[in-house]
Amino acid sequence: ELDSTAAIQQAVDFGRTYAMVTFFPEGIYTVSGTIKAWSLTRVGGEWENGKINREDFYVPVLVGSAAGASRPVIRLAPGTFPDYDPGDRRFVVEFRNFNPPSNRSFTDENGATRFRYEFPPVRLASTERERFGENTPDHIGPEFRGIDIEIAENNAGASGLRFPTAETSGVGDVEIRFLGDGHVGFQGPPGGGSATLNLTIIGGRIGLDTTNQNDQTGGFPNQGTGAQPTPVLTGLTL
């Protein structure tokens, strides 16, 4: 069975870097790990002439084709995350927004101060985590729509979609289904000014977790507590 993890990750990263949609034609895409739809918080010093001068400050937008008989499916392979651990949620698709580390400044050839930013590794040593605080209130604009997530058997530690975001973002026309045991279907509906539309979750220990902030998943500190204010959900089926 073809493993699409690396190809999807490359496409998501490319789309974010160049402000493009990552488009999924109809089909089944099998993955053997988490698709990391990660972004970095924009900071004022990185704007020039009304444009972002750092490509990494755009956000991922994942959209599935609506032209086929069924939606495209991201399918987690059997036995990818077999061990259940309530303190370590392993998602099929994971949206995160990080505060860039502040110790990467340098002076360019024109004498101007610039910044080098980096994304954190998948797992961080405890001494490194504070440099990559997760910032949900400034997680603005990502989308995940028209794509189903299927979690195959022997994945008791697997969760579906993590989407803790702020305004102008959204999830729509998505079904998350567990074919065996599993953990959380959907965590973190976006806050006010966004929407979660036509979402179906089948199976799992927890269908919907509205914890949008103060989530230590993966060991990253997160600003704020509880959920983003005034989330809008319609067409929700659990």
Q: Which role does the model predict for each range below?
A:
Residues E1-L238:
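Extracellular/periplasmic carbohydrate-active domains that bind, remodel
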